[in-house]
Design a protein with these regions (language model features):
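Mixed-charge, Lys/Arg-enriched low-complexity segments
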Residues: 3, 37-94
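Amphipathic, interaction-prone secondary-structure segments
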Residues: 2-40
């Protein structure tokens, strides 16, 4: 069974994780007057990437999902970042 897309309800906007040929792509939806709706990619996850690299990308995605603190870090605990990483890896097929 392959999961193609997962949508996570974020702090201010939803985060969409979609399966690609090489792994997964994490996007957010942005609305502009000129272009209308656009999907902005915030991370690419390759199946053959090492775990540290995927964790660093999950930390950046967690900033969008959970918001940031006053220092600009993700307002999430380590286990919350691991939950985001787990969903990204499920879609990518890691």
């Amino acid at each position: 069974m392959n999961i193609r897309t997962i949508v996570i309800e974020g702090h201010e906007q939803d985060v969409k994780i979609s399966r690609t040929e090489r792994g997964a792509e994490v996007t957010i939806e942005q609305h502009t007057r000129r272009a209308g709706k656009q999907d902005i990619c915030i991370a690419h996850i390759a199946r053959d990437e090492n775990r540290e690299s995927r964790y660093a990308k999950a930390t950046e995605v967690a900033k969008v999902v959970y918001g940031t603190d006053c220092r600009g870090r993700a307002a999430a605990t380590n286990s919350m970042v691991h939950e985001v990483l787990n969903e990204m890896e499920r879609v990518a097929g890691c």
